Design a protein with these regions (language model features):
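Membrane-interface alpha helices of multi-pass inner-membrane proteins
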Residues: 202-203, 237-260
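Membrane-interfacial entry segments at the cytosolic side of transmembrane helices
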Residues: 63-70, 234-240, 272-289, 439-451
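Transmembrane alpha-helix segments characteristic
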Residues: 16-23, 76-79, 241-244, 389-409
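Short acidic/glycine- and proline-prone juxtamembrane loop motifs at membrane-interface regions
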Residues: 206-214
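Transmembrane-helix motifs of polytopic, lipid-linked glycan transferases
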Residues: 57, 162-182, 376-381
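Transmembrane-helix signature of polytopic, membrane-embedded enzymes
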Residues: 158, 175-197, 395
Length: 471
């Protein structure tokens, strides 16, 4: 078992990134990515692939307490720096502290600012009473959280972002503990470091939207549920924490809650834990959970799932036809059935500048590239888990990740970075396991994957430029 991030893999990743960037920039020279985002991407890629190998070795000798202290300190420092810099950057280019195209962010802020001056009775009636939205509760969680922050601190925009930096840093510790329990202490530390240095997790701390809090709840749900399933003794707090966490996911995005319940049921069904081998107990747990789903999910849950499912036709068909009409015939082949098999590698990195609305994707291109490159280790992890007959131990993370990403990839949002982001906590765990199980035979395949990654980035650049009729 490899217990550190190998330097030679990091060097390959960096070289592959610059080869991809140079090829895309030269071929689509007129639409080359803005220089500021090239610099930002270079910083993020260097930070991730230089410091992860170094710290995975240096921090392996630390006590758990010191490791957690170092991990949180690094994570929160990086995130706070980004929060401050992005705040003033957005003020400079937009005149307000919101990113380009921040309709959702401004909506959340405006609603929370307005409701923060109202009574709690009015607030709960607004969200849960007769006047509540017909779309259900799937977008209630973040507005409630944000207006609570505003009630305490006032409608100061930077305060929630500072809290996001702390929440995201805490998530790094959760990912470490989950991975350490599932695999090995030193392997778990690699997962924590990668989480701390993951560019998109840093960038989202500067956004006024729900993704950071949502990812924290996803990671906490997986960690607490894994603890529950592996523990031989149960107490009310352990059980209630898992239930409350999966319940909270329904308040952020119904599909997340469904994926969480599905993952729990799958884990119980295939668990090798001695305490879960009592057939009657297993049937009782599954039966009770199914009953809860039927009772609680008869309305809004199925409505949102159906909406995502229906969009796999209406959304993606409309997008493909529009793009094809503008000269990119490849768009006709970007169906859900094509995108779904690539779900562990999505989204592709945007290394071209086609319009000002896309600058957010340019800013996040480094994080998307890391997902493209590290997908190799997710595939290796799945292969090794099956080969070694250890897949039952990892059903919780795997079932959640693929249940969620599967629905998204078939719904017309197959390359939407924001919609794919909730799969990242599970993928971080899978990357770590695949990396730890790398063998000489599988390592040889990495050079072919690097070529494939270059083709991914070039192909996506062609798709972005062609879909807008720019050549």
């Amino acid at each position: 078992m490899i217990q550190f991030f190998p330097q030679q893999i990091a060097r390959r990743a960096i070289v592959t990134y610059f080869v991809s960037l140079i090829i895309v920039s030269c071929v689509f020279f007129s639409y080359a990515m803005l220089f500021e985002y090239v610099v930002l991407g270079t910083i993020f890629i260097s930070l991730f692939f230089v410091m992860t190998p170094r710290w995975s070795v240096d921090w392996s000798i630390l006590t758990e307490k010191n490791y957690v202290r170092y991990l949180f300190s690094i994570a929160v420092t990086l995130r706070l720096i980004w929060v401050v810099l992005s705040y003033f950057h957005y003020m400079n280019i937009n005149g307000d502290p919101f990113e380009v195209g921040a309709a959702d962010a401004k909506g959340y802020h405006g609603e929370a600012e307005w409701l923060s001056s109202e009574s709690w009775a009015y607030i709960f009636n607004y969200y849960f009473g007769a006047a509540a939205s017909t779309t259900g509760f799937s977008d209630v969680g973040y507005p409630l959280y944000l207006l609570t922050v505003y009630k305490i601190f006032g409608p100061i925009i930077i305060i929630p972002r500072i809290l996001k930096a702390c929440i995201s840093s805490w998530m790094c510790i959760i990912i470490y503990r989950l991975s350490a329990r599932m695999f090995d202490e030193k392997v778990g530390r690699i997962a924590g470091i990668m989480c701390a240095l993951m560019p998109n997790l840093i960038i989202y701390c500067g956004y006024h939207i729900k993704e950071t809090e949502m990812l924290f709840l996803i990671a906490a749900f997986m960690e607490r549920t894994d603890y529950l399933l592996r523990n031989h003794k149960y107490n009310i707090w352990t059980i209630m924490s898992a239930i409350l966490l999966v319940g909270s996911l329904f308040l952020f995005r119904t599909v997340l809650g469904v994926a969480g319940v599905f993952a729990f049921l799958t884990s119980v069904l295939f668990s090798n834990t001695p305490s879960m081998k009592r057939g009657l107990k297993r049937v009782a747990i599954i039966g009770w959970s199914l009953l809860c789903i039927i009772v609680a999910g008869g309305g809004a849950l199925m409505t949102e799932i159906e909406e995502y499912w229906n969009k796999k036709d209406t959304n993606s068909d409309a997008k493909r036809m529009e793009q094809a009409s503008k000269g990119n015939q490849w768009a006709l082949y970007a169906t859900g059935s094509v995108m779904a098999p690539m779900v562990v590698a999505l989204p592709f990195a945007t290394m071209v500048h086609v319009d000002d609305i896309q600058v957010g994707q340019e800013a996040k291109h480094a994080g998307n590239y890391i997902r493209n490159f590290m997908a190799f280790f997710a595939l290796i992890g799945m292969y090794e888990a099956i080969r070694q007959k250890k897949w039952r131990d990892f059903t919780l993370v795997g079932a959640y990740t693929f249940a969620y990403l599967g629905v998204i990839s078939l719904s017309g949002f197959g390359n939407s970075e924001r919609f794919l982001l909730p799969g990242l906590p599970g993928l971080l765990v899978m990357w770590t396991y695949g990396l730890s199980q790398l063998r000489e035979q599988t390592y040889r395949l990495l050079k072919y994957w690097c070529v494939l990654v270059v083709l991914m980035e070039f192909g996506w650049g062609f798709f972005k430029v062609g879909s807008r009729g720019l050549f």
